[in-house]
């Protein structure tokens, strides 16, 4: 009887503890693939999970997840979006060449696929994402209006798909995915001044203060979103570095003063420790080669307080 109680207690720990990772099995076959490996990029993790492809393109992989999340299945330049959750078993048949060309609907799931993955397939096959030439040719006012229209259209793609299918789904994941697909558009704001000057040098319009619509649309300083949304870290680190750079664009003091003021600006943002640390690390790495011994000592000292 005592052993039965112990077994039940262990089972309860696994079921009740959300941090206990559970296995997800993915197997299938690739055609027109590159090399002899397939990779899984799990949102929020720095390392990849890899699986070997045999001579016929077959593979089998076991992932460990503690909750439903976004996973990219990758081979060469082909990448396919998946929603995977603890306990799932998935079989997939994929032509890597077609995926590289954006034919996401060509993927076959012999044993069925979840609504979340179908939502992403629908989105990526129908999303509105302008070319560089189309995106940066517009004046600041036109650019802002265009981005606002694109966001509305793309959000509609997701919401309409979810409403049209009455089956259940992970609402939290869908909400995070709606943030995820905005990140590439949000990043375009960082490149707008340079690309616009190249593509439309005649336009001398001033950039208004409320130019960046993603200042309000995308949450900032939220550890959960920062860690869970695919490539959100890259966006937010760039966002805060750009914000500080703009505040210091007219600074004319000595390098040592600049780095001290930079860290003062970072502290004034009151960011979560992880985010502040990542922002500082990015800034330091970008300027590492130009640092004098005096500046290095300042950076070493100020970094301890981040």
Please name every model-derived segment:
Residues 3-13:
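Sec-dependent N-terminal signal peptides
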Residues 5, 36-37, 236, 258:
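Acidic, low-complexity intrinsically disordered regions
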Residues 16-176, 180, 188-192:
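A non-transmembrane, solvent-exposed segment enriched in polar/low-complexity residues
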Residues 49, 271-272:
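Ser/Thr-centered flexible coil motifs
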Residues 114-115, 139, 226-229, 272, ...:
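Intrinsic-disorder/low-complexity, polar/charged segments
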Residues 134-261, 265-269:
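N-terminal, charged low-complexity regulatory/assembly segments
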Residues 179-193, 274-289:
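Short, hydrophobic/amphipathic alpha-helical patches that form generic packing surfaces
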Residues 260, 276-306:
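N-proximal helix/coil linker or "cap" segments that precede and/or mark the start of modular domains
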């Amino acid at each position: 009887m005592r052993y039965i109680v112990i077994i039940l207690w262990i089972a309860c720990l696994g079921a009740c503890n959300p941090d206990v990772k559970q296995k997800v099995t993915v197997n299938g076959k690739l055609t027109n693939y590159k090399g002899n490996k397939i990779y899984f990029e799990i949102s929020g993790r720095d390392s990849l999970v890899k699986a070997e492809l045999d001579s016929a393109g077959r593979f089998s992989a076991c992932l460990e997840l503690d909750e439903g999340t976004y996973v990219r299945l990758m081979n060469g330049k082909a990448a396919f979006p998946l929603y995977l959750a603890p306990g799932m078993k998935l079989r997939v048949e994929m032509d890597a060449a077609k995926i590289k060309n954006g034919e996401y609907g060509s993927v076959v799931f012999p044993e069925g696929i979840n609504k979340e993955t179908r939502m992403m397939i629908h989105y990526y096959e129908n999303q509105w994402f302008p070319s560089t030439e189309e995106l940066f040719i517009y004046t600041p006012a036109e650019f802002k209006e265009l981005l606002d229209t694109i966001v509305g259209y793309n959000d509609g793609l997701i919401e309409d798909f979810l409403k049209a299918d009455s089956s259940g789904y992970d609402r939290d994941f869908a909400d995070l995915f709606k943030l995820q697909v905005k990140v590439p558009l949000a990043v375009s704001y960082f490149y707008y001044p340079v690309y616009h000057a190249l593509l439309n040098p005649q336009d001398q319009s001033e950039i208004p203060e409320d130019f960046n619509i993603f200042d309000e649309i995308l949450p900032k300083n939220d550890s959960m979103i920062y860690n869970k949304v695919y490539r959100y870290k890259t966006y937010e680190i760039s966002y805060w570095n750009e914000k500080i750079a703009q505040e210091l664009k007219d600074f004319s003091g000595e390098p040592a003063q600049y780095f001290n003021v930079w860290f003062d600006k970072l502290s004034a943002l009151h960011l979560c420790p992880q985010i502040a640390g990542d922002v500082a690390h990015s800034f330091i790495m970008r300027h590492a080669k130009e640092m004098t011994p005096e500046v290095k000592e300042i950076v070493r000292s100020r970094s301890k307080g981040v």
